[in-house]
Regions:
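Surface-exposed, charged secondary-structure patches
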Residues: 68-118, 122, 127-131
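Short, low-complexity N-terminal intrinsically disordered segments enriched in polar/charged residues
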Residues: 1-43
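Short solvent-exposed beta->alpha transition segments
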Residues: 31-32, 47-87
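Internal amphipathic alpha-helical segments of the cytochrome P450 catalytic fold
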Residues: 46-47, 122
Length: 131
């Protein structure tokens, strides 16, 4: 459990509670999960990169898998420079968000998308992709 998916009283927020929040409040709860993922990737820190992933996604993103991805994109594109929020999508069983993402060695604009779900009593990243 992390501070960003908790109510002010310290208890974990459910997906239904998150869905009741305003877009700004919802972003404030979910953006830190993306911060962890991106900073973990930039620093090649597997534990930080996957700390907010579901078990399913952790099985896919192994230390070796992350190392290979980082080696490839950092050589070609650099590291993450900044992101701009684009959209938020509320679903019955998940929340999806998209951002425009920029890298330090590229002028291209990339799309970062992530899907958040409730698993094991906390909000986690179930899917994420950069393209």
């Amino acid at each position: 459990m992390t501070d960003h998916d908790q109510n002010p009283d310290g208890r974990s927020m459910s997906l239904s509670e998150l869905l009741a929040l305003s877009d700004e409040e919802l972003r404030a709860c979910l953006e830190p999960l993306i911060d962890n993922m991106l900073s973990g990737s930039a620093d090649r820190d597997h534990a930080r990169h996957v700390q907010d992933f579901t078990t399913r996604l952790k099985v896919i993103v192994t230390q070796e898998n992350l190392a290979a991805q980082c080696e490839d994109y950092q050589k070609r594109l650099g590291t993450f420079a900044r992101r701009e929020f684009v959209a938020l999508f509320r679903r019955r069983a998940s929340i999806a968000m998209t951002w425009r993402l920029f890298f330090t060695k590229s002028e291209d604009e990339f799309v970062l998308e992530a899907m958040f779900v409730e698993r094991q009593g906390r909000i986690q990243i179930e899917h994420c992709m950069i393209f």
